[in-house]
Amino acid sequence: VQTFTGRCLCGQSHFTVNVEMLDVYACHCTLCQKWSGGIAMYLEASGHPLMSPESIEPSHFPSSTRGERFFCSGCGCPLWFTLTDSDRYFIPWTLLELNEVDRRRLILAAEIYTETQPAFWRLTGQYARLSGKEVEEMDYPCHLAH
């Protein structure tokens, strides 16, 4: 497990997170599209984000029956979403302060909810491409009911 520091766009929300692998999950579900403005790319983390004492309290809302989304109260930047029945949460990898070595270790592990992926964007590479049904049938990262 590695611990990383993360910050929102305005810098008022800063935190540390524990990440086991630098596997990125690209989610195409309609909720993530609305939340991110396009394709959402997350790392899976465990435990709970530890907010810095001088950080502002993040805002949050239940986005489905199984998950909650958190965002910076200052700038509105998406921070992470949690699964209500799990100790897992998903954080945009772009929020983390990664050094050059860690940035090179990032891999695209899977594209999920591919049935709602717009035709005008395509990622390339060798990795899993799963529909929402496939994701929900298995205990796969980002298996939030959308």
Annotate each language-model stretch with its function:
Residues 1-7, 12-146:
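A short Gly-Trp-Pro
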